[in-house]
Amino acid sequence: MELLKNKIIEEGRVLSDTVLKVDSFLNHQVDPKLMKQVGEEFAKKFRNTGITKILTIESSGIAPATMTGLELDVPVIFARKRKSLTLTDHLFTAEVYSYTKKTSNEISVSKDFLHEDDIVLVMDDFLANGQAALGLLEIAKQAKATVVGVGIVIEKGFQTGGKQLRDKGIRVESLAIVESLSDGTVRFKEEARI
């Protein structure tokens, strides 16, 4: 998605060979026009799959998932990272390790919202080592829901998450795949092959 790639180049900041900061438009401040186009793009990719729910994780997955849900006219469920006083039992849970924050979180979704007859699109802002996506897939599995794929805004193609999911036969659609962040420069997958 060219608009997204341009935004990454213009506003993204490479903090290291593995860390890309995009907080000016995706995971702190959100660019609604960009998110609308992200939603439209994912809707095009998954429109004919019969999706009944979109499953994401708080908090940075919520904006792209919501815009996709709006385009597909389906509800969005977000897994919580912290226990809520109103969300105590009757939960699907999974353990997710964050390499960025170096912490492990138990994520949870109420059993009231995810069911065996649901057809689910899993979404997140980033795919790096795949831990968040695997946690969301585990929750969908516990619900006995059918997963049609994983939608990712930015995939770090140089990390193992995308390969790990694809090797399991999971359809992964990423709007931008970053092949390298070396030398402080963002290189996308298509550019690396030229």
Swiss-Prot record:
One Pfam match, given by its short name, reads Pribosyltran
Any one Gene Ontology biological process term?
A: xanthine metabolic process
- Gene Ontology CC: cytoplasm
Q: In which pathway does it act?
A: Purine metabolism; XMP biosynthesis via salvage pathway; XMP from xanthine: step 1/1
Tell me the GO molecular function terms.
xanthine phosphoribosyltransferase activity
**Catalytic activity, reaction form:** XMP + diphosphate = xanthine + 5-phospho-alpha-D-ribose 1-diphosphate
Which residues are recorded as binding 5-phospho-alpha-D-ribose 1-diphosphate?
A128, N129, G130, Q131, A132
Please tell me which top-level EC class this enzyme sits in.
Answer: transferase
Keywords, A to Z, come to: Cytoplasm, Glycosyltransferase, Purine salvage, Transferase
| Binding residues annotated for xanthine, in chain numbering | L20, N27, K156
**What HAMAP family does UniProt report for this protein, alphabetically?**
XPRTase
Its quaternary organisation is:
Homodimer.
Q: What does this protein do?
A: Converts the preformed base xanthine, a product of nucleic acid breakdown, to xanthosine 5'-monophosphate (XMP), so it can be reused for RNA or DNA synthesis.
| Protein name listed in UniProt | Xanthine phosphoribosyltransferase
Origin organism is: Oceanobacillus iheyensis (strain DSM 14371 / CIP 107618 / JCM 11309 / KCTC 3954 / HTE831)
Could you tell me the gene encoding this protein?
A: xpt
